[in-house]
């Protein structure tokens, strides 16, 4: 099983993206493929879940571990397969979905593609109360950026190793993420400038 892949985003289609990793193109189904557009031809980190069936080996991709955890919770519900779970993630704001499940809001849940009344009731039965205070196994809507920027992640880790606090770095991370295409060293320089202000 794979936990995540680090590779170059080389193709985007209506339902999938392709990550080139050491000359092999991995076709990965994702909730919102075009949300990855800004990262085309850059190194990305994508969390994955592999589904092996007799007729296919499929990879499903997620922007972070929390989105993956939500997906795994959804596919544990009878009547929800991987494609339906991706459609729900694509159509939902995760907080609203979690609130609807915890509050047994069947009407809200049946608005999702492929979710009828019976499946919505099963979602409530199987998942109500299974989410922590921050959401689906720790979902943070702030972390749900289109994809991880490998160079930025390396820069943040390097700054933490130098003794900068995670809270300080969180404050400037969004500003840094807007500066796409920089190397780790350039991100570090930019971060230091922002923290000096």
From Swiss-Prot:
Database matches in CDD domains: UBA_RuvA_C (cd14332)
Gene3D superfamilies: 5' to 3' exonuclease, C-terminal subdomain, DNA helicase RuvA subunit, C-terminal domain, Nucleic acid-binding proteins
Region (Domain III): 147-197
InterPro entries per the UniProt record, alphabetical: DNA_helicase_Holl-junc_RuvA_I, Hlx-hairpin-Hlx_DNA-bd_motif, NA-bd_OB-fold, RuvA, RuvA_2-like, RuvA_C, RuvA_C_sf
Region span, Domain I: 1-63
SUPFAM superfamilies: DNA helicase RuvA subunit, C-terminal domain, Nucleic acid-binding proteins, RuvA domain 2-like
S-S bridge residues: none
Pfam families reported for this sequence: HHH_5, RuvA_C, RuvA_N
A Gene Ontology biological process term: DNA repair
Keywords from the UniProt entry: Cytoplasm, DNA damage, DNA recombination, DNA repair, DNA-binding
GO cellular component: cytoplasm; Holliday junction helicase complex; Holliday junction resolvase complex
Positions of region (Flexible linker): 142-146
Chain segments carrying region Domain II: 64-142
Molecular functions (GO terms): ATP binding; four-way junction DNA binding; four-way junction helicase activity
Presence of keyword RNA-binding: no
Localization, UniProt: Cytoplasm
Keyword DNA damage appears in the UniProt entry: yes
Domain of life where this protein originates: Bacteria
Signal peptide residue numbers: none
NCBIfam families to which the protein is assigned, alphabetical: ruvA
Swiss-Prot/TrEMBL domain comment: Has three domains with a flexible linker between the domains II and III and assumes an 'L' shape. Domain III is highly mobile and contacts RuvB.
Subunit-level organization: Homotetramer. Forms an RuvA(8)-RuvB(12)-Holliday junction (HJ) complex. HJ DNA is sandwiched between 2 RuvA tetramers; dsDNA enters through RuvA and exits via RuvB. An RuvB hexamer assembles on each DNA strand where it exits the tetramer. Each RuvB hexamer is contacted by two RuvA subunits (via domain III) on 2 adjacent RuvB subunits; this complex drives branch migration. In the full resolvosome a probable DNA-RuvA(4)-RuvB(12)-RuvC(2) complex forms which resolves the HJ.
UniProt similarity note: Belongs to the RuvA family.
Free-text function comment from the UniProt entry: The RuvA-RuvB-RuvC complex processes Holliday junction (HJ) DNA during genetic recombination and DNA repair, while the RuvA-RuvB complex plays an important role in the rescue of blocked DNA replication forks via replication fork reversal (RFR). RuvA specifically binds to HJ cruciform DNA, conferring on it an open structure. The RuvB hexamer acts as an ATP-dependent pump, pulling dsDNA into and through the RuvAB complex. HJ branch migration allows RuvC to scan DNA until it finds its consensus sequence, where it cleaves and resolves the cruciform DNA.
This protein's name: Holliday junction branch migration complex subunit RuvA
Species: Lactococcus lactis subsp. cremoris (strain MG1363)
């Amino acid at each position: 099983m794979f936990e995540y892949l680090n590779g170059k985003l080389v193709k985007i289609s209506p339902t999938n993206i392709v990550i080139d990793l050491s000359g092999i193109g991995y076709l990965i189904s994702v909730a919102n493929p075009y949300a990855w557009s800004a990262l085309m031809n850059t190194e990305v980190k994508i969390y994955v879940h592999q589904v092996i069936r007799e007729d296919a080996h499929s990879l499903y991709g997620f922007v972070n571990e929390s989105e993956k955890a939500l997906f795994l919770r959804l596919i544990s519900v009878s009547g929800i397969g991987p494609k339906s779970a991706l459609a729900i993630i694509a159509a939902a704001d995760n907080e609203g979905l979690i609130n609807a499940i915890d509050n047994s809001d069947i009407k809200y849940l049946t608005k999702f593609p492929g979710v009828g009344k019976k499946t919505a009731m099963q979602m409530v039965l199987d998942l109500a109360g299974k989410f922590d205070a921050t959401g689906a196994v720790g979902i943070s809507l702030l972390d749900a950026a289109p994809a991880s920027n490998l160079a930025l992640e390396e820069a943040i880790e390097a700054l933490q190793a130098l003794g900068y606090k995670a809270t300080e770095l969180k404050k400037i991370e969004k500003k840094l993420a807007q500066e796409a295409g920089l190397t780790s060293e350039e991100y570090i320089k930019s971060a230091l400038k922002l923290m000096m202000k």
